A protein has these predicted regions:
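Selected transmembrane alpha-helices and immediately adjacent juxtamembrane segments
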Residues: 1-22, 103-151, 158
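A helix-boundary/kink motif common to multi-pass secondary transporters
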Residues: 24, 79, 83, 143, ...
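Transmembrane helix-bundle signature of multi-pass membrane transporters/permeases
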Residues: 29-36, 151-158, 214
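Transmembrane helix exit motif
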Residues: 40-50, 72-73, 77-80, 84-110, ...
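Cytoplasmic-side transmembrane-helix entry/capping segments in multi-pass membrane proteins
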Residues: 53-63, 84-88, 108-117, 146-153, ...
Length: 227
């Protein structure tokens, strides 16, 4: 939550790089559902002009939400080993594209939005990490506040799909809902702390260090599940 509040990104990546070491990855994805929904809703609604962002990126938002909802229906049937590998690949993709500043000439055209939404949903439904959204929003070269709002909106829509999907698949039940709400409360506290210290941090230094940690943990997940 503190990372999310200070940098605007990285919440699912940080959590999914750590939790699968201790619990089943499907459970980790389930526990993230409500925190992703709430923290990203808080993020994009705090930026002036958010109604216009919804109108501009509605196709991407709907695409990622629907795709995640569908994919989550099958996550309980996928062996944990393969989910861990997908999580690891998602973490590596997320960290490397950010570290290498990999950019593609992106467009707000609905076809681009649908492609980004579907690819993010396929990864996000299994790992909660939606690296294509980061590649897309960075490639659009948006002003900082607009970038935070667009990324927050798309992750928020992914959170809706994840929450509804885990409910539909009975992964989010009485016990896991309570645990997810506890995680949400902790994340929101961290989010507020991060927002307060944002101006005191060197975004570049902190972001780079975190990305290297995420890369290392992603590699660890893949190697331990392949060997």
């Amino acid at each position: 939550g503190t990372v999310k509040g200070s940098l605007g990104i990285g919440f699912p990546a940080i959590v999914m790089s750590i939790l699968p070491i201790f619990i089943e990855p499907a459970l980790a994805v389930t526990l993230l559902a409500i925190p992703i929904f709430v923290t990203n809703g808080t993020q994009f609604l705090s930026v002036e002009g958010w109604p216009g962002i919804i109108r501009r990126f509605l196709v991407a938002g709907i695409s990622v939400a629907v795709t995640i909802f569908v994919v989550v229906q099958f996550v309980a049937d996928v062996p944990s080993r393969w989910i861990n590998i997908v999580v690891g690949l998602s973490l590596i993709l997320f960290s490397l594209t950010s570290l290498l500043k990999f950019e593609l000439p992106m467009s707000e055209h609905p076809s681009w939005q649908a492609l980004v939404g579907i690819s993010s949903g396929l990864l996000g439904g299994l790992s909660a990490v939606k690296a294509p959204i980061m590649i897309y929003t960075v490639g659009l070269k948006l002003p900082r506040d607009e970038f935070i709002c667009v990324a927050g909106f798309l992750f928020f829509m992914g959170g809706i799909g994840l929450t509804m999907g885990t409910l539909s698949a009975s992964l989010l039940n009485g016990t896991t809902t309570l645990l997810s709400l506890v995680c949400c409360a902790i994340a929101l506290i961290g989010f507020r702390v991060g927002a307060m210290i944002r101006k005191r941090l060197s975004d570049k230094v902190v972001r780079t260090a975190l990305l290297w940690v995420i890369l290392a943990l992603g590699l660890r997940l893949i190697l331990t599940n392949l060997l």
